[in-house]
């Protein structure tokens, strides 16, 4: 038995059949997998056929929607999103030889849907994009209509009496004047209507413009619901602040014009008073002349006085508008008025007798610039000024404080 066992092992070691133990029913080292069935091709094909048969049964029980329904609203209509009304084309079997026009097919589909209802099997409904209807915007007013309305408002203001003319009317005319000037400077017709300020003449409701620039002062006071600040008072808008500043500037301009006219009359009256009274008392005579002029107005004829006041008022308004239209000429006239006033004041007030002292100080060499100067800088003992004046200028031997305009002028020179 031992000999047979040894021979059996030798034969198994020298044999090339590696998997012969798999078919050995007696056992061995690979008995764990000997229970598996051999792979039979016929059995495998039968199992696969059963699987695919079950898959076909599932497909028959749950059919998928046709591809045409994806482009219509009858089905899911998923692919109609973003198609913008492009119709789906039913392609026949010989699609390679025939060219289709998408627009023509879409038109034909629309005509068929309007006239007759065709067969659903032959034709595919065209994809229709839903449309939204909006209310028509209000017609935009023509620039000529707006301009005519503005001209009518200005003419109505011009026809008013002088007593009934208010500051709001002046603001309307000023705003229209700024529009015209803005259009003239830009050179475009569209800028004639555009303006950064609130237009008093137009009755157009612009809530955003009213929020940004505020409303007219008269309109703002008449509002029922007004914003309140923390203290309980009405909060002033930015537009009202601009309007108040504008009112203040125009009032200052009117006062300046009145002072200019009074100054001319005062100058003429002062010359007449100087001829009569001589040298002194110029300021006193000027005051008397102004009071006499004020007293003469109510004593004279009422119609003549009112005509004079009317003429002066419109003259002032024209001067304000002229200053806005031609700012360069207004500045030049202002400078000339200042020079004439200086010349007129020079006739009344003679220069002080300290000119000789100033001339002596100019002849000295220029000292150092500062709040004080040394005695040597003013020439010391060689100064042409006497001892008392030198002590007044130089409070101490080290320097002096500048007390008069003449000393400051010497330091500047």
UniProtKB/Swiss-Prot annotation:
Assigned GO CC terms: nucleus; plasma membrane
Biased composition (Acidic residues): 103-124
Chief location of this protein within or outside the cell: membrane
Expression by tissue: Expressed in the node of the stem, initiating leaf founder cells, young leaf primordia, tips of axillary meristems, spikelet pair meristems of developing tassels and ears, male flower primordia, tassels, ears, silks and seeds. Expressed in leaf sheaths, leaf pulvinus and shoot apical meristem (SAM).
Description of the deletion phenotype: Reduced shoot gravitropism and defective inflorescence development. Reduced shoot gravitropism and increased leaf angle.
Biological process, per Gene Ontology: gravitropism; regulation of auxin polar transport
Motif mapping: Nuclear localization signal 1: 275-298
Residues annotated as transmembrane: 71-91
Localization per Swiss-Prot or TrEMBL: Cell membrane; Nucleus
InterPro entries the record matches: LAZY1
Functional summary from the UniProt entry: Involved in the regulation of shoot gravitropism, and tassel and ear development through the regulation of polar auxin transport (PAT) and auxin signaling. Acts as a negative regulator of basipetal PAT, but positive regulator of lateral auxin transport. Involved in the regulation of shoot gravitropism and leaf angle through the regulation of cell development.
UniProt-listed PANTHER family: PROTEIN LAZY 1
Family that this chain belongs to: Belongs to the LAZY family.
Name of the featured protein: Protein LAZY 1
């Amino acid at each position: 038995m031992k000999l047979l066992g040894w021979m059996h092992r030798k034969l198994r070691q020298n044999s090339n059949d590696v998997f012969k133990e798999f078919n050995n029913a007696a056992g061995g080292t690979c008995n764990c997998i000997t229970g598996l069935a051999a792979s039979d091709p016929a059995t495998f094909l039968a199992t696969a056929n059963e699987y695919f048969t079950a898959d076909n049964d599932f497909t028959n029980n749950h059919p998928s929607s046709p591809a045409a329904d994806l482009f219509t609203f009858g089905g899911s209509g998923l692919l109609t999103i973003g198609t913008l009304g492009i119709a789906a084309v039913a392609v026949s079997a010989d699609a390679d030889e025939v060219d289709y026009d998408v627009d023509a097919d879409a038109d034909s589909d629309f005509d068929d849907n309007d006239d007759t209802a065709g067969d659903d099997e032959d034709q595919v409904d065209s994809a229709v994009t839903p449309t939204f209807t909006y209310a028509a915007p209000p017609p935009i007013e023509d620039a000529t209509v707006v301009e005519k309305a503005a001209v009518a408002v200005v003419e109505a203001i011009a026809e008013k009496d002088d007593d009934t003319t208010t500051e709001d009317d002046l603001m309307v005319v000023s705003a229209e004047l700024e529009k015209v000037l803005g259009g003239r400077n830009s050179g475009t017709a569209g800028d004639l209507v555009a303006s950064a300020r609130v237009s008093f003449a137009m009755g157009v409701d612009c809530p955003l413009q009213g929020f940004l620039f505020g409303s007219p002062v008269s309109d703002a006071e008449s509002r029922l619901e007004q914003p309140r600040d923390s203290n309980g008072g009405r909060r002033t808008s930015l537009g009202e602040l601009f309007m108040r500043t504008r009112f203040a500037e125009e009032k200052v301009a009117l006062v300046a014009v009145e002072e200019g006219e009074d100054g001319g009359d005062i100058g003429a009256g002062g010359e007449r008073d100087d001829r009569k009274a001589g040298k002194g008392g110029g300021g006193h005579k000027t005051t008397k002349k102004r009071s006499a002029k004020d007293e003469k107005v109510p004593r004279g004829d009422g119609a003549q006085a009112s005509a004079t006041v009317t003429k002066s008022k419109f003259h002032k308004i024209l001067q304000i508008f002229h200053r806005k239209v031609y700012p360069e000429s207004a500045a030049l006239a202002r400078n000339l008025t200042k020079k004439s006033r200086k010349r007129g004041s020079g006739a009344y007030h003679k220069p002080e007798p300290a000119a000789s002292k100033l001339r002596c100080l100019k002849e000295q060499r220029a000292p150092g610039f500062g709040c004080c100067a040394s005695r040597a800088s003013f020439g010391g003992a060689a100064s042409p000024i006497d001892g008392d004046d030198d002590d007044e200028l130089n409070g101490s031997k080290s320097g002096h404080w500048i007390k008069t305009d003449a000393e400051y002028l010497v330091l500047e020179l």
